[in-house]
């Protein structure tokens, strides 16, 4: 008798995706982040759902409702901090996942890669809107500054900003719609994740060597299910440690001050996971130029497959490209640091140098080094 997981209409889809899926035998821990992102998404949706039961999206009561959740709701403090720090974990896993894709050449699966970029934008939009909801000082001013960037779009900019605000400033209408979209977007992200997996399973997984692994495949279960569960335990332990010992480590103290349109905080900055893009935005003295650079800092991932000049897929056997890759990582850390600093000397010039280096490495140096490596290997 055939096993039910192979015949049942629903179970056979799950079976072909998570049980009998042929996977390369050489996958390292860098391949854990996809499943970790799935866990992060589940944690965020669950904690977010319970938070939404107690939250009110009104400018008069939003801040107090978050205080009420932390003080009066059973384990409300835990829900709130799991949700806030869960977002940080989400982005740590996201950036490592994208970095893995860049290092090992996973971007050659163009459909999977493009859906991934779309997912990155969707998660960033969700996180931005979520940061506005507690209605603290940084929530209000962050929303004002970032939405105002759209006014740099020629001709329609000002109308577009007022349309998003639902008035002439960030106010009640803005908060209400941000809450609606913040609730809706994670479910759109979940649907996109399914499409992402659908495209991935059309081609099968890449592996660290970048060499086709068709002759050497192993079943996903039990080998990689066990490996993924270990990853879950490590990540959830890290998240629990952060939440229970220093829940405000990654937050901004200004967000414990209720939003006040008449008082601007000394340094307006987004959460740490947007600081690299914020630094690129600030490094250009022109508003429209800054907005374009900001968008391109993420959108540049879409042209990475076109810029792939190497005859090899992965960087595993390309030491020169590896050096450039880690230089890029160092540049991103520098940008993240600069994004959190005030706009003054020497931070301005460091930010501008790092921004130029970021685009220079991806657009010119990596393709050039790939061609040099091809030449050295007589390919």
UniProtKB/Swiss-Prot annotation:
Transmembrane segments: 33-53, 77-98, 113-133, 178-198, 226-246, 288-308, 320-340, 347-367
Details of cofactor binding: Binds 2 heme b groups non-covalently.
Residues noted as binding heme b b566 in the record, renumbered to the chain: 97, 196
Entry membrane topology: Multi-pass membrane protein
Biological process, per Gene Ontology: mitochondrial electron transport, ubiquinol to cytochrome c
Binding-site list for heme b b562: 83, 182
Cofactor or coenzyme needed: heme b
InterPro entries in the record: Cyt_b/b6_C, Cyt_b/b6_C_sf, Cyt_b/b6_N, Cytb/b6-like_sf, Cytochrome_b, Cytochrome_b_C_euk/bac, Cytochrome_b_N_euk/bac, Di-haem_cyt_TM
Major subcellular location class: mitochondrion
Chain segments annotated as coiled-coil in the UniProt record: none
GO MF assignments: metal ion binding; ubiquinol-cytochrome-c reductase activity
Sorted UniProt keywords: Electron transport, Heme, Iron, Membrane, Metal-binding, Mitochondrion, Mitochondrion inner membrane, Respiratory chain, Transmembrane, Transmembrane helix, Transport, Ubiquinone
Domain of life of the organism encoding this protein: Eukaryota
GO CC terms in record: mitochondrial inner membrane; respiratory chain complex III
Binding site residues for a ubiquinone: 201
Record-linked Gene3D superfamilies: Cytochrome Bc1 Complex, Chain C
Similarity comment: family membership: Belongs to the cytochrome b family.
Described purpose of this protein according to its UniProt entry: Component of the ubiquinol-cytochrome c reductase complex (complex III or cytochrome b-c1 complex) that is part of the mitochondrial respiratory chain. The b-c1 complex mediates electron transfer from ubiquinol to cytochrome c. Contributes to the generation of a proton gradient across the mitochondrial membrane that is then used for ATP synthesis.
Subunit record text: The cytochrome bc1 complex contains 11 subunits: 3 respiratory subunits (MT-CYB, CYC1 and UQCRFS1), 2 core proteins (UQCRC1 and UQCRC2) and 6 low-molecular weight proteins (UQCRH/QCR6, UQCRB/QCR7, UQCRQ/QCR8, UQCR10/QCR9, UQCR11/QCR10 and a cleavage product of UQCRFS1). This cytochrome bc1 complex then forms a dimer.
UniProt-recorded name of the protein: Cytochrome b
Gene: MT-CYB
């Amino acid at each position: 008798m055939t096993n039910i997981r192979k015949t049942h209409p629903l179970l056979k889809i799950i079976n072909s995706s998570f049980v009998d899926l042929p996977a390369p035998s050489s996958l390292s821990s860098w391949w854990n982040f996809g499943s970790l992102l799935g866990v992060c998404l589940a944690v965020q949706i669950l904690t977010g759902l319970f938070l939404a039961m107690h939250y009110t999206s009104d400018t008069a009561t939003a801040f107090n409702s978050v205080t009420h959740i932390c003080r009066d709701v059973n384990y409300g403090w835990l829900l709130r901090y799991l949700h806030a720090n869960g977002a940080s974990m989400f982005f740590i896993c996201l950036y490592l996942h994208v970095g893995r894709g860049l290092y090992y050449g996973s971007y050659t699966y163009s459909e999977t890669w493009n859906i991934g970029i779309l997912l990155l934008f969707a998660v960033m939009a969700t996180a931005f809107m979520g940061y506005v909801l507690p209605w603290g000082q940084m929530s209000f001013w962050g929303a004002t500054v970032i939405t105002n960037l759209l006014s740099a779009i020629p001709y329609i900019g000002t109308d577009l900003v007022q349309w998003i605000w639902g008035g002439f400033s960030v106010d009640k209408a803005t908060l209400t719609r941000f809450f609606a979209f913040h609730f809706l977007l994670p479910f759109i992200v979940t649907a996109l994740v399914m499409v992402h997996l659908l495209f991935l399973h059309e081609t099968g997984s890449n592996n660290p060597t970048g060499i086709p692994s068709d002759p050497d495949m192993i079943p996903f279960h039990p080998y990689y299910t066990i490996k993924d569960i270990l990853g879950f335990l490590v990540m959830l332990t890290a998240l629990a440690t952060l939440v229970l010992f220093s829940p405000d480590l990654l937050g901004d103290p200004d967000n414990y001050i209720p939003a006040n349109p008449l008082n601007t905080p000394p340094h307006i900055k987004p959460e740490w996971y947007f600081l690299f893009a914020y630094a690129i935005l600030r490094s250009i003295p022109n508003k429209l130029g800054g907005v374009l650079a900001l968008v391109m800092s993420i959108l540049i991932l879409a042209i990475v497959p076109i810029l792939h000049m190497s005859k090899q897929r992965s960087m595993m056997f390309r030491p020169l490209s590896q050096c450039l890759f880690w230089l890029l990582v160092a540049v991103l850390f520098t940008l993240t640091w600069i994004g959190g600093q005030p706009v003054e000397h020497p931070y301005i010039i460091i930010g501008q140098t790092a921004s130029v280096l970021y685009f220079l490495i991806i657009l010119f140096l990596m393709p050039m080094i790939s061609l040099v490596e091809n030449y050295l290997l007589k390919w």
